[in-house]
Amino acid sequence: MRLLLALLVLAAAPPQARAASHWCYQIQVKPSNYTCLEPDEWEGSCQNNRQSPVNIVTAKTQLDPNLGRFSFSGYNMKHQWVVQNNGHTVMVLLENKPSIAGGGLSTRYQATQLHLHWSRAMDRGSEHSFDGERFAMEMHIVHEKEKGLSGNASQNQFAEDEIAVLAFMVEDGSKNVNFQPLVEALSDIPRPNMNTTMKEGVSLFDLLPEEESLRHYFRYLGSLTTPTCDEKVVWTVFQKPIQLHRDQILAFSQKLFYDDQQKVNMTDNVRPVQSLGQRQVFRSGAPGLLLAQPLPTLLAPVLACLTVGFLR
């Protein structure tokens, strides 16, 4: 009787409940032999209203003078990092725990890993966007609050800033020799759950734009961009992109696979943009804000007005 009841319950369950609970990106749903939860079906907090990524409308950002410079500790230390294909992205495990403070953060955070999102298309691989513009890739350096600095752990595990992610856009440009050890490591980890070690030591600063540009960033509260999409992330999205050569960018889509059979290339591992809702995006108050347009473009209207005034 119990077996019959269990079978009836299973038969009455909706298709999503019977599907494999393994989550995936939209591109993985297309192969007929793939059964997984696509982004609209992701579980946990993924259907809540304070989600990431978002489109940052720069004209609607609010200046926050408290968003000053970051203090980076251990970011200059070279290390032969462990690199992993986890079935969703390539992840670099930051074992020596670099850390950050400042930048309007409430405390110090330790880096645990970095990973990337990408596409074969040079304008479709970033998760966040600026005024609707997307980039070839996006790199996330994930940090957690240092233990002992969060107060009562049981009370703070649900804090909206328990995790701090530094996000960097990546655009098609000149070859980036500092990224080459990571790019070369991809050949050793084509399938999920494979690990390797970089053949050459790299520091986090090696992977970032020049330090002076790190004063310019956007800030908002959101979530992880993968299940269970916990809403406990303070996001810092930097304005200055990293440059990689097109061949370096395409290597991620060509050398990595979602599946053990190496039939589904790992690409377009990007969550769709989520609604910002009532949240506010802030921008750093550092002087000399990076310009979204070339200086001549911005000066043209001013010069035109001055010319008209002079002629009068």
Curated annotation (Swiss-Prot):
<dbReference type="InterPro" id="IPR041874">
    <property type="entry name" value="CA4/CA15"/>
</dbReference>
<keyword id="KW-1003">Cell membrane</keyword>
<feature type="glycosylation site" description="N-linked (GlcNAc...) asparagine">
    <location>
        <position position="33"/>
    </location>
</feature>
<dbReference type="Pfam" id="PF00194">
    <property type="entry name" value="Carb_anhydrase"/>
</dbReference>
<feature type="propeptide" description="Removed in mature form">
    <location>
        <begin position="285"/>
        <end position="312"/>
    </location>
</feature>
<dbReference type="GO" id="GO:0008270">
    <property type="term" value="F:zinc ion binding"/>
</dbReference>
<dbReference type="InterPro" id="IPR036398">
    <property type="entry name" value="CA_dom_sf"/>
</dbReference>
<feature type="glycosylation site" description="N-linked (GlcNAc...) asparagine">
    <location>
        <position position="152"/>
    </location>
</feature>
<feature type="domain" description="Alpha-carbonic anhydrase">
    <location>
        <begin position="21"/>
        <end position="285"/>
    </location>
</feature>
<protein>
    <recommendedName>
        <fullName>Carbonic anhydrase 4</fullName>
        <ecNumber>4.2.1.1</ecNumber>
    </recommendedName>
</protein>
<feature type="binding site">
    <location>
        <position position="140"/>
    </location>
    <ligand>
        <name>Zn(2+)</name>
    </ligand>
</feature>
<feature type="disulfide bond">
    <location>
        <begin position="46"/>
        <end position="229"/>
    </location>
</feature>
<comment type="subunit">
    <text>Interacts with SLC4A4.</text>
</comment>
<feature type="lipid moiety-binding region" description="GPI-anchor amidated serine">
    <location>
        <position position="284"/>
    </location>
</feature>
<feature type="disulfide bond">
    <location>
        <begin position="24"/>
        <end position="36"/>
    </location>
</feature>
<keyword id="KW-0456">Lyase</keyword>
<feature type="signal peptide">
    <location>
        <begin position="1"/>
        <end position="18"/>
    </location>
</feature>
<keyword id="KW-1015">Disulfide bond</keyword>
<keyword id="KW-0479">Metal-binding</keyword>
<dbReference type="GO" id="GO:0005886">
    <property type="term" value="C:plasma membrane"/>
</dbReference>
<feature type="binding site">
    <location>
        <position position="115"/>
    </location>
    <ligand>
        <name>Zn(2+)</name>
    </ligand>
</feature>
<dbReference type="InterPro" id="IPR023561">
    <property type="entry name" value="Carbonic_anhydrase_a-class"/>
</dbReference>
<keyword id="KW-0472">Membrane</keyword>
<feature type="glycosylation site" description="N-linked (GlcNAc...) asparagine">
    <location>
        <position position="265"/>
    </location>
</feature>
<dbReference type="GO" id="GO:0004089">
    <property type="term" value="F:carbonate dehydratase activity"/>
</dbReference>
<feature type="binding site">
    <location>
        <position position="117"/>
    </location>
    <ligand>
        <name>Zn(2+)</name>
    </ligand>
</feature>
<keyword id="KW-0862">Zinc</keyword>
<feature type="glycosylation site" description="N-linked (GlcNAc...) asparagine">
    <location>
        <position position="195"/>
    </location>
</feature>
<keyword id="KW-0336">GPI-anchor</keyword>
<feature type="binding site">
    <location>
        <begin position="225"/>
        <end position="226"/>
    </location>
    <ligand>
        <name>substrate</name>
    </ligand>
</feature>
<dbReference type="InterPro" id="IPR001148">
    <property type="entry name" value="CA_dom"/>
</dbReference>
<keyword id="KW-0325">Glycoprotein</keyword>
<comment type="function">
    <text>Catalyzes the reversible hydration of carbon dioxide into bicarbonate and protons and thus is essential to maintaining intracellular and extracellular pH. May stimulate the sodium/bicarbonate transporter activity of SLC4A4 that acts in pH homeostasis. It is essential for acid overload removal from the retina and retina epithelium, and acid release in the choriocapillaris in the choroid.</text>
</comment>
<keyword id="KW-0732">Signal</keyword>
<keyword id="KW-0449">Lipoprotein</keyword>
<feature type="active site" description="Proton donor/acceptor">
    <location>
        <position position="88"/>
    </location>
</feature>
<dbReference type="GO" id="GO:0098552">
    <property type="term" value="C:side of membrane"/>
</dbReference>
<comment type="similarity">
    <text>Belongs to the alpha-carbonic anhydrase family.</text>
</comment>
